[in-house]
């Protein structure tokens, strides 16, 4: 468990879950064993996941990345240039309609590789359980 996290009432973390710095796990969220919750991410109340929650993102419902955690990023002093680079990466990774491998390659060639973007890409590449899906992703092939 990282530093500065928020773990609200009723949140359930199974064994070997890793929660990175400044992550927020809202009330009554459920996290499957061996999952990772990324830095400055947020799980909305009543969410559940058996996949990794990427850093800097808001996760909702089941395995669904809704958006960047823009309020959290600003509260922690991230400037507009860093947020813009993350937003560009986010749009390709979670809204671009590409499979994750192609999306990673596109981000590496088209987006400014700031420290934050590199951290996001490294987190996704290191995932053993897979990361949460972008909103609107056809998940039928994964079920």
Where are these regions (language model features)?
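Terminal amphipathic alpha-helical/low-complexity segments used for targeting or macromolecular assembly
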Residues: 55-56, 62-143
């Amino acid at each position: 468990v990282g530093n500065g996290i928020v773990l609200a009432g009723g949140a359930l973390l199974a064994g070997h879950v890793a929660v990175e710095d400044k992550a927020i796990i809202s009330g009554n969220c459920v996290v499957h064993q061996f999952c990772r919750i990324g830095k400055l991410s947020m799980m909305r109340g009543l969410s559940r996941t058996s996949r990794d929650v990427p850093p800097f993102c808001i996760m909702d419902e089941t395995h669904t990345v809704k958006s960047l955690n823009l309020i959290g990023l600003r509260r922690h002093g991230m400037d507009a240039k860093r947020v813009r680079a993350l937003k560009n990466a986010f749009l390709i990774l979670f809204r671009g309609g590409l499979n994750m491998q192609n999306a990673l390659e596109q981000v590496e060639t088209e987006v400014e590789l700031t420290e934050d973007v590199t951290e996001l890409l490294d987190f996704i590449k290191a995932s053993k359980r897979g990361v949460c899906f972008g909103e609107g992703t056809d998940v039928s092939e994964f079920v």
